[in-house]
Amino acid sequence: MKKNRERFSSKEREFVYKFQIGSERLELRVPLRFPVDENASHLHGRLMLLHSLPCFIENDLKEALARFIEEESLRDHDSDAEACLEAVKSGEVDLHQLASTWAKAYAETTLEHARPEEPNWDEDFADVYHDLIHSPASETLLNLEHNYFVSISELIGERDVELKKLRERQGIEMEKVMQELGKSLTDQDVNSLAAQHFESQQDLENKWSNELKQSTAIQKQEYQEWVIKLHQDLKNPNNSSLSEEIKVQPSQFRESADAAGRIYEEQRKLEESFTIHLGAQLKTMHNLRLLRADMLDFCKHKRTQGSGVKLHRLQTALSLYSTSLCGLVLLVDNRINSYSGIKRDFATVCQECTDFHFPRIEEQLEVVQQVALYARTQRRSKCKEARDSGNQNGGSDEKSKNAERNYLNILPGEFYITRHSNLSEIHVAFHLCVDDNVKSGNITARDPAIMGLRNILKVCCTHDITTISIPLLLVHDMSEEMTIPWCLRRAELVFKCVKGFMMEMASWDGGISRTVQFLVPQSISEEMFYQLSNMLPQIFRVSSTLTLTSKH
């Protein structure tokens, strides 16, 4: 049967088409390889173009070609079926095995024989995890997750050491070659060595990438199976080993933590908190925080698990499947990847700990790329239709051409979302596209970055995100042109716009209390921080404090 299929796949037949131009009779002969994988319409178009055929035979040629392909394909299918039957008759194929295969396929594809639809694994696991994290087993879950995190961190450390050694060795080799350049070696030798070094680095990075991917996949499977098993054991009141199973990991972890004796020292953060009221008729109360911190500090796990760190992690886990999610805004460029800048740093943090609930960051970005490509293609086709109908002016034409030219990227003000369960204090990341215009001092409330913030806050209202962290100055790092007046103008603009958006939110969600965290870069001075802190009560209506005194 395989031999017949091989002959069938390599078979060629000649398509003959006769037509007449005036008194001259012509004949077109084209060899076709069967089976024909190409669409008949595409093949017909190629024939018309390649042989410069007249347009009046176009439809007739198309019908003749489609008919020829259909007839010859049916003939090949019939001969292939005959060969299969002969193989069954001759005993080359086991009849009973073939019958069981057909019966299984029929039962799986026919509704009356199909099994009842099983519950979705992800939904089951989410429900089970939500039950366990709100039970006495929560500490066990967190410690197991932390042990997995330490394991991956050690693996990443080994990778970094090996890559560093390779780069140092390659640097020494390149220095020696450069010393001989022009003497015994040429530019071609240098380029050849550089290419070898690049290939060696790529091979080593791919090796470690595959190892990390495999390790995280194993961890995820083990963790999910263990969670399901623990949940089943909790339902069995007669299981005497259950309490020991829950207790063993915390005690082991505390011993290892005490043995390590490491104290995590992070850069001192500046922080101010405010309680504000918005609205005149429908009053809503919200919490605002101004922080001097790195945006990724909300994502990073600590190698040692102090009480404060553990409480943050517990709170994040408790609210993972709740209506009180936490999000942050990352300012990124227009390319949907994790190759540079804060995108690369964020992806590195995500890779340090296995995500047991959602796909890896790379898989989520691949899905976003496909969605963005589809959306941009749809937008491009609509722009083309509008241009063809003559309803667009020159400026719109230029804008649509620009969209066509960059249809694989997103535009300033657009954003994409990734979901995470493996970050310290964050469930959702909004990747907001901005351009170099945010570094200028003349942006307005209609700037794409500002409108992007508005749309992000709207998503927060409709998707149960009650805490959102926003870069106040719309930058993650300070530069020379960002003077004190620049910072004050930018902060005032963002404060006022966010205030307006939060007042809009009252009509979107009914006035749910939310927490908005405004972050400024760590390199900003204390004096500048306190100037921004003094500005906030001038824009938002801060709740007045009430001082209680006792009478003696």
Curated annotation (Swiss-Prot):
UniProt superkingdom: Eukaryota
Entry keyword Transcription: no
Pfam short name (any one): Fy-3
GO cellular component: cytoplasm; early endosome; protein-containing complex
Principal subcellular localisation of the protein: cytoplasm
Compartments, as annotated in UniProt: Cytoplasm; Early endosome
Keyword GTP-binding appears in the UniProt entry: no
Keywords noted in UniProt: Cytoplasm, Endosome, Phosphoprotein
GO biological process, one term: regulation of mast cell degranulation
Annotated positions of the Phosphoserine modification: 79
InterPro entries, alphabetized: Fy-3
Self-association and partners: Component of the FERRY complex composed of five subunits, TBCK, PPP1R21, FERRY3, CRYZL1 and GATD1 with a ratio of 1:2:1:2:4, respectively.
Function of the molecule: Component of the FERRY complex (Five-subunit Endosomal Rab5 and RNA/ribosome intermediary). The FERRY complex directly interacts with mRNAs and RAB5A, and functions as a RAB5A effector involved in the localization and the distribution of specific mRNAs most likely by mediating their endosomal transport. The complex recruits mRNAs and ribosomes to early endosomes through direct mRNA-interaction. Plays a role in mast cell degranulation.
Protein name (Swiss-Prot/TrEMBL): FERRY endosomal RAB5 effector complex subunit 3
Organism: Rattus norvegicus (Rat)
Organism taxonomic ancestry: Eukaryota, Metazoa, Chordata, Craniata, Vertebrata
